[in-house]
Swiss-Prot record:
A biological process term (GO) from this entry: photoreceptor cell differentiation
Stated name of the protein: Steroid receptor seven-up, isoform A
Annotated Low complexity bias: 56-68, 171-191, 606-645
Keyword DNA repair tagged: no
DNA-binding region per Swiss-Prot/TrEMBL record: 197-272
Length: 746
């Protein structure tokens, strides 16, 4: 509609003209001429038959209204079209802008040179009147009147923009603006193309932009941000030179983070996580609320809800990714194949480990403790994660997908597998029926991870290995000092006592203590021999040469500290008993009570009030001490009561003469350091009755007690001629439902 050189042959007009944005393509330049000034040869004189068409088009709208007078000189609608074609003025010789435009335009050059407004606003009116008189007969007046308001608006706007620019041969024209805008758009387009082709400096994948100082992909960007925000530390299983590319970037996190830093990604560019202003940080909360006596609810002004909410928010923030990222497991009615289930199970396990590494206080533990905790609770965490993501489990599709019906697996294994799947499915369905939300799942997982019993189990499993090592060192005649070796055991037992005392406040100590008591048989055997040596026996026993390994287990974990006065007597007695003939192991005392469970006389001790740093005074197991029968011994003194623990009557130590040393015990030389180890441990701990730990021995009554030779155990079992031997069938049990006052009964 607008007159421009694009109507002439040889030009390409991709779309209709508009007065808003102009580019080289809009004004009719060919594509090869869009980036520079067209040469002189690009223009040609149109045929004579086209001259009238161009003139009529230029002057068409102007024939109805004549010239339009403005404040700075005249402008006409024909000048609108001529301004759009003013880009080719740069190719022409710079004409004088003060001369008046002629009324006739024999060619394109005259039309362009005479259409520009002069600096003093002179010649636009003359140009319009001349062009109007030359070609007014061929124009429809109605068309011009309809387009008058639109053309007037465009003409006024363009006049204002042109008036603001200095005119002349060196002036800025719309052509230069159009060329500059086109070049900018071309440069931006080339930048976008080049950005899309840039590879990630870390793994070589397609870059999504510049992140933290370097062009990286989204995966490396997220990995670097997560590592910096959470202060994560990694370890390399190789030589710290693992290949990091698109296919191996997830195999070694240490080398990946190392390469991120090497390529120039900046830690300081990562924004740290912000705590909302309404919720103070945990550090400030710890300083604000000073917990007294371990009871946070007793603090004045303490808001337990806000305090716990802050921890819950931290647990939720530690989630590696929302449950919607688990994929198709979120679809309740979807039946998954065995491959997808295996992949999802691995993903759930990895997410549990990732979650545990980011929750409060867990990273502060040692790496060995972290691994031990996760090994203990991974199954519970897996069930909670599977229920949280609504993992669909159906036994029949699982078996069909796994091909168990055609597998060579034995029938009993298939049945066991079915039982495991069924139990797992029942647990998941029960949790799903409760409609547990994300916060509750996070709290449940934290409770499972930080259960006190799990921490004690770790220590309990370490003690037998430690004691075995100590026994090996002492048995081989190591040059190391026995006191130094036993100090390690004593420190470990002190730590167990501390943990045990803390757990008793939560009413969980008996079960954990019972589980730990499976390794006390060695020391109890030595102590029992010392006790039975002082009780008159009616039958002689056969000599057994089986060695006795000192096993200072949890026999001392709930015991009272002894005074220093009885140490020498106990040491002398144990040294003598290590070389003496084993006494009769009939297991009975004068009163007919079975002494195999440790309910007889204890070792000599002097109760010391106030020395309860290692004593578990609040233990419910102490009630079993009050009911323990004392042996019928004339030398037994009266019981010494204490304010915290009921003591068992004990006999006085019987000095052993040197003739006892000439007994026929084959392993006497070996048992001397063993007896010393047991004696040194017994200086600080008093052996509790074995009846208090019956459930542990019920679990292991088919196996030989820890630290006692097989031959020695069988000899003790057969020498009495009855079923109540020392290490035969146990005569104690744990009754959790007893109403007799003590849950531990004979």
């Amino acid at each position: 509609m607008c007159a421009s050189p694009s109507t002439a042959p040889g030009f390409f007009n991709p779309r209709p003209q508009s007065g808003a944005e102009l580019s080289a393509f809009d004004i009719g330049l060919s594509r090869s001429m869009g980036l520079g000034v067209p040469p002189h040869s690009a223009w040609h004189e149109p045929p004579a038959s086209l001259g009238g068409h161009l003139h009529a088009a230029s002057a068409g709208p102007g024939t109805t209204t004549g010239s339009v007078a403005t404040g700075g000189g005249g402008t006409t609608p024909s000048s609108v079209a001529s301004q759009q074609s003013a880009v080719i003025k740069q190719d022409l010789s710079c004409p004088s802008l003060n001369q008046a435009g002629s009324g006739h335009h024999p060619g394109i050059k005259e039309d362009l040179s005479s259409s520009l407004p002069s600096a003093n606003g002179g010649s636009a009116g003359g140009h319009h009147s001349g062009s109007g008189s030359g070609s007014g007969s061929g124009v429809n007046p109605g068309h011009g009147s309809d387009m008058l308001p639109l053309i007037k608006g465009h003409g006024q706007d363009m006049l204002t923009s042109i008036k603001g620019q200095p005119t002349g041969c060196g002036s800025t024209t719309p052509s230069s603006q159009a060329n500059s805008s086109h070049s900018q758009s071309s440069n931006s387009g080339s930048q976008i193309d080049s950005k899309q082709n840039i590879e990630c400096v870390v793994c070589g994948d397609k870059s999504s932009g510049k992140h933290y100082g370097q062009f990286t992909c989204e995966g490396c960007k997220s990995f670097f941000k997560r590592s910096v925000r959470r202060n994560l530390t990694y370890s390399c299983r190789g030589s710290r030179n693992c290949p990091i590319d698109q296919h191996h970037r997830n195999q070694c996190q240490y080398c990946r983070l190392k390469k991120c830093l090497k390529m120039g990604m900046r830690r300081e560019a990562v924004q740290r996580g912000r705590v909302p202003p309404t919720q103070p940080g945990l550090a400030g909360m710890h300083g604000q609320y000073q917990i007294a006596n371990g009871d946070p609810m007793g603090i004045a002004g303490f808001n337990g809800h806000s305090y716990l909410s802050s921890y819950i928010s931290l647990l939720l923030r530690a989630e590696p990714y929302p449950t919607s990222r688990y994929g198709q497991c979120m679809q309740p009615n979807n039946i998954m194949g065995i491959d997808n289930i295996c992949e999802l199970a691995a993903r759930l396990l990895f997410s549990a480990v990732e979650w545990a590494k980011n929750i409060p206080f867990f990273p502060e533990l040692q790496v060995t403790d972290q691994v031990a905790l996760l090994r203990l609770v991974w199954s519970e965490l897996f069930v909670l994660n599977a229920s949280q993501c609504s993992m669909p489990l159906h036994v029949a599709p699982l078996l069909a997908a796994a091909g168990l019906h055609a597998s060579p697996m034995a029938a009993d294994r298939v049945v066991a597998f079915m039982d495991h799947i069924r139990i797992f499915q029942e647990q998941v369905e029960k949790l799903k029926a409760l409609h547990v939300d994300s916060a509750e799942y996070s709290c449940l997982k934290a409770i499972v991870l930080f259960t006190t019993g799990k921490l004690l189990d770790i220590l309990y499993k370490d003690v037998p290995a430690l004691l075995t090592k100590v026994s090996a060192l002492l048995g081989k005649g190591s040059t190391a000092s026995n006191d130094d070796v036993l100090a390690v055991v004593r420190d470990h037992l002190d730590e167990l006592n501390r943990q045990e005392q803390e757990s008793q406040a939560q009413q969980q100590a008996p079960l954990h203590l019972a589980a730990f008591m499976n390794c006390v048989a060695g020391v109890e055997a030595a102590v029992q021999q010392a006790e039975q040596a002082q009780v008159p026996t009616s039958s002689a026993s056969a000599s057994v040469s089986a060695p006795l390994v000192p096993s200072a287990g949890s026999a001392f974990s709930s015991c009272q500290a002894k005074s220093a006065g009885s140490e020498m007597d106990l040491l002398a007695s144990l040294y003598a008993q290590a070389q003496a003939t084993p006494p009769s192991s009939g297991g009975g005392d004068a009163s007919g009570h079975n002494n195999s469970s440790g309910l007889g006389a204890s070792l000599p001790t002097q109760s010391q009030s106030g020395s309860s740093s290692r004593n578990l005074t609040a233990s419910p197991l102490s009630t079993s001490l009050a009911t323990a029968p004392a042996p019928a011994s004339a030398s037994a003194p009266a019981p010494v009561p204490t304010s915290s623990v009921a003591q068992v009557p004990v006999p006085a130590p019987v000095p052993v003469t040197s003739s006892a040393s000439s007994s026929s015990l084959g392993g006497g030389a070996y048992q001397t350091p063993s007896a010393a180890a047991a004696a040194a441990a017994m200086f600080h701990y008093q052996t509790p009755p074995r009846a208090a730990f019956g459930s542990a021995f019920d679990m292991f009554h088919h196996s030989t007690p820890f630290g006692v030779g097989v031959g020695h155990a069988h000899a003790l079992a057969h020498s009495s001629g009855s079923g109540s031997a020392s290490f035969g069938s146990p005569s104690y049990r744990y009754s959790p439902y007893s109403l007799a006052g003590s849950r531990w009964q004979l």
